[in-house]
Amino acid sequence: MTQHDVFVATEYPAPVVRAVIEVALGTAFQPSHGPEPVPALTIGPTKVFFHDSHPFEDDADFAVSRYRYWVNVEDSARDQQRQLAIAQRVFDAVKAEGWPAMLSFGLQGNLAVYP
């Protein structure tokens, strides 16, 4: 399944960034259960995962090293329109805070970048 991702650059601590996303999506992150537990929230069949960091490096079409946080959005029903709509809400929320952000699809370049 291909996912949408939002990368965020800010010096604010993770709880502040998560709180902005929670307000935008109207629900709270909960600890996820897995080998690498990361905070996650659920909106219907769509899950939003918040990572304090990411393992990605820059390439020609994907300059990601400037971003500190990684928000991964995946829809278990494979509804890419719903998945994109939720990722866009996350992107818009962090953009409204004035934080640099990038919205991508499948980690293959960007759909939107701010600023």
Language-model segment annotations:
Residues 1-30:
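Short, extreme N-terminal segment that most often corresponds to the first beta-strand
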Residues 5-7, 47, 68-72, 100-104:
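Ordered hydrophobic segments in well-structured contexts
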Residues 8, 28, 47-52, 80-83, ...:
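A short linear-motif detector with a strong N-terminal bias
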Residues 11-12, 72-79, 106-108:
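Short, flexible beta-strand-to-coil junctions
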Residues 21-23, 46, 89:
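Hydrophobic/basic alpha-helical segments enriched in Actinobacteria
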Residues 28-77, 114:
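Short, intrinsically disordered low-complexity segments
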Residues 81-115:
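Acidic, proline/glycine-rich low-complexity IDRs
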